[in-house]
Structure formats: structure tokens, C-alpha cells
Design a protein with these regions (language model features):
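Short, conserved, GDST-rich strand-edge loop motifs in beta-rich repeat architectures
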Residues: 169-183, 223-244, 297-312
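Short, solvent-exposed loop/turn segments at conserved positions within beta-propeller repeat blades
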Residues: 45-46, 86-88, 129-130, 176-183, ...
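Residue position within the beta-strands of beta-propeller blades
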Residues: 42, 83-84, 126, 168-169, ...
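A short beta-strand motif characteristic of beta-propeller blades
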Residues: 19-23, 59-64, 101-106, 143-148, ...
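Residue-level detector of Asp-centered blade-edge/turn motifs that repeat once per structural unit
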Residues: 35-37, 75-79, 118-121, 161-163, ...
């Protein structure tokens, strides 16, 4: 017993030493960039706050307290920030981009999960998770112009086709659990016509989609999710027998699934893939793996070169059997992917500027920065860790 308690005590002391005794709990849930990547914002889910950090990410410059936790943020051409907040009666806030003062506050559906400003329609688009809808909102009047029925629990979206279309990631499959195939579907919404013009089904078993990112040229989209092996007997858990952590690649020109690659290796899992981004130079894909406390960094150029060769039947790695087997191949990313520990618990969000990657440890209250090679890691403690509360500890054990 002593051998177990001593290391745990040391960890607790080290965590305690990094924040003041009277510090309030801060659980950094999401990160956003504004002002063309010059401004970094972090959310505090425990305190319903939106915090603007200094340019080096080392201190909080401004903050605003809202009605409930922030789920998403976008910026309009005037520089104002539009923020949607969690809850059965969600709220949409308009904030002054410089002062963070509240300009307006509007009720906005059941759990608005993502928001973006469209330069094509000059309006705001909001995914309503538990309404299973996409809303178009006039920023001048803040009134709903259009409601579009989409898939089950939409959680994230990204523009493509010159911003004239939206690719929407739905969290859960719509079909019953006895169906085959059973998988999450993505919706394609045409902005000018305000209609769903296509649907893309992810591989059988795809569930818990969390995030979608698009490259600068809007050629490919990347979606994080799990693949659950519903049709297999539950007689083992290792090597992805029951579930795997996955990145699906969407060909936006063809508007169809290209393939899916496993973030796991045969020896370790990249548990709970949360946020995904493409770095501004289009050279890397970064995934925040919240359950394994690390970032998964993929060489995007090498990935697409490998996929092109595999499509032609080349054996690009020793484990590749065929193109159709790639979604089951835990060795496909060998040599073009690495794992970067975030030195904390629960990294859920990730953003990147021209020279830095930022993530945030949700349970241990740290903003983490590093260079684009995953080196020179720095941590800034934001407050008391959520992991030190009963609710936070239970939540951490569950996730």
C-alpha cells in the first residue's frame, strides 16, 4: 500500500504547488483563434467563462462570464465575436471583439454546438445538437431565417467549395443498433439554396464523431470518431477488437468518403479523439486524444502520398493487405505519425498558428504551447484543477 500511496501523494503535492490555494477551478475546454490567428481564447467550462490570453499564451488579459459553458465561437467581418453557450435553452452572445463586452444576448435552441459566419450568405450558421437542426441567423436582427433538418446530434461543421457548402459532423448514428451498416452520417448543406444536397456515411460502426477540419484549399476534410465493432463478440478488448479511434478522410471534390485510418497502434490506443485541425501550412493534421493525454501529429503530405500509392495496389507498409482493409489496419500510419504527451489530463481542443500549437488540459487546468514540431513545450496553469473536485474526478474516471 505504501508503494502506491507515496507516488500518488507526490503527484498531488506537485499539482498543488502550481496554483494558489484560493484559486478558483478552471477547466479549459475549448480553444479558439480570432483576428487572423493573432488572438487566442480559452473557455473555462467550470466557470462559464471566455478568456482572452496574451499573445504568448502565458497570462489572461480579459475575460467575460456568460450564462453557461461556451461551446463555439466565430468572428464576423466587423471583428465582433459570436459565441454559443451550452444548455437546454442555449444562448448566443455577440461580444465586442476588443473589450469582450456583451453587445447582445439571444436564446438559441437546445444545446447550440457550433457556429460560423458565412461570407457567402452574410449570416450566422448554428448547429443545434438536440434539435437535430442547422439554423441560419441574421446577425443584424438575431432572428432565425432558416431551419434545416439534418442528422442526429450535429456537433461540428466546416465550410468548403469556396465557402458555398457546409460539411456537418453528426455525433451519433440515426439507425437502430440492430441495423447493418450502422454508422454516423455527415450532411452537406448548400449555403445559397439552404438545402441538404448530400450525405456521406462513415464506415460501419462509426460513432461519437467530435470534430471536422478542412485543409486550406478545401480539398479534403478530416473527421474524428470511434469505430465500434458491434457485430463482434465481446470476448476481448485489446488490439481494437471492440472499438478503435479513427480519423476519416473525406474527398470534398468527389463529396464522398476516401477512407478511414486508425489513430491507434497495435500496442497503444489514441483514446477519445476529440478536436482535429490542419495546421496553417497544410503540412500536418493534429488530433487531441483526450483519453491518452497526448496530441497525435500526422504528416499530412506523407499521408496522402501513401494513400495514393495504396490505391494503386502498392504495399506501402508491411501490414497493408488491401485498400479496403485500411480502416482495420493499425499499422497504416507507421512512420508518419507521432504522439506528443501534453503533460496533463484531458486535452480536448487544439489550435495552431504559423509557428505554434496550443492545447489545453481540461482536468489539470493547463494551457500548453509547443512549436510545430511538438518541441519546446510550455505549460501555463490557469487555476485550480477540475480533477481536485469530486465532480471532476468522477468525470475524469468516466472519460
Amino acid at each position: 500500500m505504501k508503494k502506491i500511496l507515496i507516488p500518488v501523494s507526490i503527484v498531488a503535492i506537485l499539482l498543488c504547488a502550481s496554483w494558489k490555494e484560493d484559486a478558483k477551478t478552471v477547466s479549459p475546454d475549448r480553444l479558439f483563434l480570432a483576428d487572423s490567428g493573432k488572438s487566442l481564447f480559452v473557455t473555462n467550462r467550470a466557470g462559464n467563462e471566455l478568456i482572452k490570453m496574451s499573445s504568448d499564451g502565458q497570462k489572461a488579459e480579459q475575460k467575460v462570464t456568460l450564462s453557461s459553458p461556451v461551446n463555439a465561437m466565430t468572428q464576423d467581418p466587423s471583428g465582433n465575436l459570436w459565441v454559443v453557450c451550452d444548455g437546454n435553452t442555449g444562448m448566443m452572445y455577440e461580444l465586442d471583439g476588443k473589450k469582450l463586452s456583451v453587445q447582445s444576448k439571444t436564446k438559441s435552441g437546445a444545446t447550440p454546438s457550433d457556429i460560423l459566419y458565412s461570407p457567402v450568405s452574410k449570416s450566422l450558421w448554428v448547429t443545434q445538437r438536440f434539435n437535430n437542426e442547422l439554423w441560419e441567423i441574421d446577425p443584424a436582427t438575431r432572428k432565425v431565417k432558416t431551419k434545416i433538418a439534418i442528422g442526429r446530434e450535429p456537433v461540428a461543421m466546416a465550410p468548403f467549395a469556396g465557402d458555398s457548402c457546409l460539411l456537418i459532423a453528426n455525433n451519433l448514428p440515426e439507425m437502430p443498433s440492430t441495423a447493418y451498416p450502422i454508422a454516423v452520417q455527415l450532411d452537406i448543406v448548400d449555403v445559397p439554396s439552404k438545402k441538404v444536397t448530400g450525405r456521406i456515411m462513415l464506415p460501419n460502426g462509426a460513432t461519437d464523431a467530435k470534430s471536422v477540419a478542412v485543409d486550406k484549399n478545401q480539398t479534403y476534410a478530416y473527421v474524428t470518431h470511434l469505430i465500434a465493432r458491434y457485430q463482434l463478440p465481446t470476448n476481448q478488448l485489446d488490439r481494437g477488437w471492440m472499438a478503435t479511434n479513427t480519423l476519416s478522410i473525406i474527398d470534398l471534390k468527389a463529396r464522398k468518403l476516401l477512407t478511414s485510418v486508425l489513430l491507434d497502434t497495435p500496442q497503444k490506443g489514441a483514446a477519445n479523439p476529440w478536436s482535429v485541425i490542419v495546421t496553417p501550412d497544410d503540412k500536418q493534421i493534429i488530433v487531441a486524444a483526450a483519453g491518452s493525454q497526448e496530441l497525435v501529429r500526422i504528416d499530412r503530405i506523407a499521408l496522402h502520398e501513401r494513400l495514393a500509392k495504396a490505391k494503386q495496389g502498392e504495399m506501402v507498409t508491411p501490414s497493408v493487405k488491401s485498400w479496403n482493409n485500411i480502416p482495420n489496419d493499425a499499422g497504416f500510419l507507421y512512420g508518419i505519425r507521432d504522439f506528443i504527451p501534453t503533460q496533463g489530463k484531458g486535452p480536448r481542443s487544439v489550435v495552431a498558428t504559423g509557428d505554434k500549437i496550443y492545447t489545453a488540459n481540461y482536468y489539470t487546468s493547463e494551457l500548453v504551447s509547443m512549436d510545430l514540431n511538438g518541441k519546446n513545450l510550455k505549460k501555463q496553469v490557469l487555476g485550480a484543477p477540475l480533477a481536485f473536485t469530486k465532480v471532476g474526478k468522477g468525470d475524469m474516471y468516466f472519460h
